[in-house]
Amino acid sequence: MYKLFFIAKNNLKKHKGEVAILFALMFLAAMLLFCSITLILSGDKAVSACKDKYHAADLIVDVPQMDKEELRKIIESVDATEKCEIVPVAQIAADYYYGDMDSEDAVSFSYYVFDSSLPTYLNAFPEEFENLKDDEIVLPYYLSYTNGIGEDYHIIIGGKDYAFKVKGYAENLYFATTMNISGFYALVSHDVFEEICGKVDPVSVQLFASCKTKEGTDIDDYDVAVQRALPSDITPFTVTIDTMDVATTAITTIASSLIIVFTLLLIVMSVIIMHFSIKNFIELNIQNIGLLQATGYTAKSLRLACITEQMIIGVIATAAGILGGILCTDPLRYLSGMLSGLSGFDGISVPALVSTIVGIPLMVLVGSFIATRSYKKLTVLESLRSGITSHNFKKNHFPLETNRMPLSLALACKNNFGALKKSIFVILIIALLTMSTCIGFALFQNWALDNKTLLRLVGYEFSDIEAGTVGDEDFIEAVSKDPAVRKVNTLTTFQSVEVSYQDKTTSLGIDVYRNVNALENNYFLEGHLPEKENEIVLTNMESDILGVTLGDIVNVKSMTGTGTVPYIVSGIDQKMNNTGKKAMMSEAGIKRINSDYQYMSALIFLNDPSKAKEVKKQLEKDYPNIQFMLGEDVIGSSIETVVKAMEGICVIFVIATCFVVILTQLLLTRAQVIRERTDLGVSKALGYTSGELIRRTLMTNMPTITIGIILGILLHIAFSNQLFLTVFSFFGIKQIIFQTDLIWLVITAALILVCALVTAFLSSRGITKLEPVRILKEE
């Protein structure tokens, strides 16, 4: 065994450059794998920690203002109820600004404002946040990355500017991110809460019930039971803890999954490069291998020595990668908190540790086992003759005497076809890198620069201005006549509506629009919009849950009466909103189950969206009792975390791609210069300049890199949407089209080519130091 380690140790010393390159690749792969698995598992741990620490309710029930004790009796009458706590909440649309911003820069968003003098056991907040002062406010945890404790924070409600100091940040699983209940969770003093309630529409002040169920209770069944127990004229908004679990970890899961996919590609590339490195080592040291064989070493023992060498690199690189991941605990904690809105990141993840410790060395073992099979084919005589056989029967595709290409290009093509396997490996590496970089740019384009694709996936109809007014037809008529307005639609969302088909039942949210044909952000899959009063559109997720197809009849529970009302499934769409648990109706359709229906929000679309802020100010003057929000602000606040995550992924992909291209080119060019040292010396003796020889070396790798880039772009075009579809499938997303503009493909190609050319040029500078006479004497 010592002999194997002795050979492996000396081999490592002999080609330190290649060892360093392989180590760097494996280190990067190990660190990314450890960090991404840690991040993806941290979400569930943070959720569990939040549940235990703050006693998360199994169900929340938000109802319009009614008698508090009556609501308590109704909920407690449901057998599975173990505990119920009820507090008032003000659901408002407001403008806010902080830090260096002023009132002119205020951003619109919705708030769920709670009274800090009413602490609860379920969905609790820390004791230090009880009975706040009038100038103090507590905000959701994910805002801690944009606002510091003690900083100024202003909310404009009903024309009054409330100036606060940030007291701290609370973790509430139901408001953990904008993917949960859309709106900022806020705690204020009792007096400020009462003042706010007096300023807003009474409809906005509701009761917020937190319910704990008995052990073993099915939460969905309990949700249905609570809704059925409520009076028929009450339309509740209910959310289960299971839905919040998915929503809280959604962005973390998406971001981490994409990084894991890239990491797996990186591992595959590392194995390919290792395979080439082993082949190259055998080629360059074939005489030494022959001497060892002649002295009694078998092919098996030499093969084991090579595998041992690669395993040493792999194990040390894995350990270093894990250490690097552990040192990244603070950045990971920051990223986890920003994506999940919770602070429960606990650092080292044992599953991530085990997966990395086992995964990377195992891939190295398998890759080196396959690559070292060449040892079995070597004979002593062939090895001592430097592997040169008497004849080469391969076709000469580029005869120099008849070829019209430039000499450097012709020689480059001869080299590539002469070492076809190596060329294929390089093409595969560059293709995978190109594909992953294009994916990063596609995410950046579709989610960060232009969010139309994201908005369609979310499935929320964002307008230029959103007005929170209930059933005011005069307002709709007046605004529609405004010359600055392009169109007006209405939106009302009913949550937790019971829909059944045969023996299957589900609870979902229903979006109701006045003009369904005017929708701009709906992602329709099949069928048609619910134009008639007896039609309903279900998301792909809900249609799968119920097992329905187009034309089937589902029963929707009446909101103002008893029994159910039948609807025909006229279409299937898809959306991430409410984790895919959605349906859509027209106003005529909703009135069949809610005869008291009145719209809740007016969606105002402008001819010139750039003037939205001016139009909003004028509307606030004309209608002081109506709350207005800028659609752009709502979009920004809702998807800000997603955009930052996609920007981060793009940066990771680009940096890692440049890093791998540089390392690959270092390995290839260095090996080429060493392998062709004699040929280069002869060429110099024949009169070729160092510049010409460097140019020839550069040209050798350019054809394979160019082909790899083209192949990678084609792979991106062919398979990237399928990859995205797999990542988003847990939202019920069935169809997705991410556009990648030509400019990003050109940037990717240029990035890889520039990195490859510059690296190859710098690493081939050693040609200038070659001395023909000395080289020929050595030979």
Please report, for each region that a protein language model flagged, where it lies by residue.
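Short helix-loop junctions at transmembrane helix boundaries
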Residues: 322-355, 695, 706-774
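Peri-transmembrane interface segments
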Residues: 17, 39, 43-50, 218-268, ...
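Membrane-interface junction motifs in transport/secretion proteins
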Residues: 26-74, 443-475, 600, 604
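Hydrophobic secondary-structure segments that place a key small or acidic residue at a functional site
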Residues: 125-193, 528-587
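The feature marks short, hydrophobic/small-residue-biased sequence motifs that occur predominantly
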Residues: 36-37, 85-131, 163-172, 187, ...
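Short cytosolic juxtamembrane segments of multi-pass membrane proteins
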Residues: 2, 378-394, 765-779
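Juxtamembrane segments of multi-pass membrane proteins
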Residues: 59-61, 407-533, 537-541, 549-552, ...
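Hydrophobic alpha-helical transmembrane segments of multi-pass inner-membrane transport and secretion
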Residues: 15-43, 250-290, 308-325, 354-362, ...
